[in-house]
Amino acid sequence: MTILRKSHPLLKMVNHAFIDLPAPSNISGWWNFGSLLGLCLIIQIASGLFLAMHYTSDTISAFSSVAHICRDVNYGWLIRYIHANGASLFFMCLYLHIGRGIYYGSYMYKETWNIGIMLLFLTMATAFMGYVLPWGQMSFWGATVITNLLSAIPYVGTNLVEWIWGGFSVDKATLTRFFAFHFILPFIIAATAMVHLLFLHETGSNNPLGIPSDSDKIPFHPYYTFKDFLGVIIILASFLTFVLFFPDLLGDPDNYSPANPLNTPPHIKPEWYFLFAYAILRSIPNKLGGVIALVLSILVLALFPLLHTANQRSMMFRPISQFLFWTLVSDLFILTWIGGQPVEPPFIIIGQIASILYFSIILVLLPIAGLIENKILKW
C-alpha cells in the first residue's frame, strides 16, 4: 500500500497533501479551522443538494416549497436547519481562521492570504444569495436593500442594479438567477480552496512562534489527522446539539412571513455574520461613502502584509500588538451588536466610533505598535 500511495498519480497528490506532508511540530488547536472549513463546505454542499431537489425558484411557490420541505419531506426539517445553521458555523470558523491568521502573522504568505480573501468574498456572496431563496420578508427586503447599494456607483449604478434584478424590482428573474448562482458558487469555492491549499503547501504551514520550522517537522498523518478528527467530533457534536435544540435562534422571525413588496419590516438587517459590515455601511451618512467603507472593511485585510512593520512575525511575544488585536476583536463584537440595532441615538454615534476604531487599529495603530516593539527589543 505504501508503494501505491507514493507511486499512483492520483494517490500521490493526496499523499503529499494529507499523509506525508511535513508539518510544524508545535501547531495548536487554532490550526484546526482549515479542516473544519472543509467540513462546513461538505455539509453545505450535501444538505444544499438535497434541498435543491425539492425547492422551486419561483416567487409564487418558493416560500411554500420551503414549508413543504419542512413538513412533507422525510427529515426535510433537519436538512433545512442543518443548511441554515451550517452557514453560521461556516462563518464562525471562517472568522476564527482569519483571526488566527492575523494573530500569528500567517498573512505573510501573500498568495495564500489573498486567495483566502477571495474565498471570503465568494462565501459572503453565496450566503447573501442563499438568504434570499426562502422568499420571506427579510429575504425580499434584504435583497432589495443590499442590491440597491450598487446604484451608488456613479453613472452606471442604476443600469447595473436593473441588470442584476432582471427588471425594475426584485422579482422572479432575480430569484431564479440567485438560485442558479447560489448552486454553482460552492463548487467554485471548493476549487478556489484547492488553490488556497496548493499555495499553502508551497511554503508549508506557519506556527505559533512565527519562526521557520524546517528543522523540526513531523508527518501530517497520524499526528494532525487525529488532531483534526478530534476537532471535527467536537464541532459536529456542538453543531447538532444547536440544530436540534435551538434551530431558529440565529434566524429572523420576519422570514416566516411570505415576501410582501407592499409591507416593509420595521428593521431590515442581515444575518449575524454580516452585521459588523452592515454597521460600518450605516455609520457613514453618504450612500457611496457607505458602500466604499463596506467593501474596504473586508478588502483592508489585503493590506496586512504591507502594513507589517514588526521584526517578529507572530504576536505571541508582542504585548502592545496583542492588546490592539483583542481591542479589534472587541470592536467587531460592538459593530455586530450595533448592526442589529435601529438607526437612532445612542447607536448611531457608537457605530461611528466603532467604525473609526476598526480602520484606525488596522491601518495606523498596529503598524505603529510593531515599530515601538522593534525599539523595545533593541533596548
Swiss-Prot record:
Annotated heme b b566 binding sites: H97, H196
Cell compartment(s), UniProt: Mitochondrion inner membrane
Coiled coil spans: none
Topology with respect to the bilayer: Multi-pass membrane protein
Keywords annotated in UniProt: Electron transport, Heme, Iron, Membrane, Metal-binding, Mitochondrion, Mitochondrion inner membrane, Respiratory chain, Transmembrane, Transmembrane helix, Transport, Ubiquinone
GO CC annotations on file: mitochondrial inner membrane; respiratory chain complex III
Cofactor binding comment, as recorded: Binds 2 heme b groups non-covalently.
Cofactor: heme b
One function term, GO molecular function aspect: ubiquinol-cytochrome-c reductase activity
Positions of a ubiquinone binding: H201
Pfam families hit by this protein: Cytochrom_B_C (PF00032), Cytochrome_B (PF00033)
GO biological process: mitochondrial electron transport, ubiquinol to cytochrome c
Cysteines joined through disulfide linkages: none
Binding site for heme b b562: H83, H182
Residue stretches spanning the membrane: 33-53, 77-98, 113-133, 178-198, 226-246, 288-308, 320-340, 347-367
InterPro entries: Cyt_b/b6_C, Cyt_b/b6_C_sf, Cyt_b/b6_N, Cytb/b6-like_sf, Cytochrome_b, Cytochrome_b_C_euk/bac, Cytochrome_b_N_euk/bac, Di-haem_cyt_TM
Role of this protein: Component of the ubiquinol-cytochrome c reductase complex (complex III or cytochrome b-c1 complex) that is part of the mitochondrial respiratory chain. The b-c1 complex mediates electron transfer from ubiquinol to cytochrome c. Contributes to the generation of a proton gradient across the mitochondrial membrane that is then used for ATP synthesis.
Family listed: Belongs to the cytochrome b family.
Note: Heme 1 (or BL or b562) is low-potential and absorbs at about 562 nm, and heme 2 (or BH or b566) is high-potential and absorbs at about 566 nm.
Record text on subunit structure and interactions: The cytochrome bc1 complex contains 11 subunits: 3 respiratory subunits (MT-CYB, CYC1 and UQCRFS1), 2 core proteins (UQCRC1 and UQCRC2) and 6 low-molecular weight proteins (UQCRH/QCR6, UQCRB/QCR7, UQCRQ/QCR8, UQCR10/QCR9, UQCR11/QCR10 and a cleavage product of UQCRFS1). This cytochrome bc1 complex then forms a dimer.
The protein, known as: Cytochrome b
Organism this protein belongs to: Chaetodipus californicus
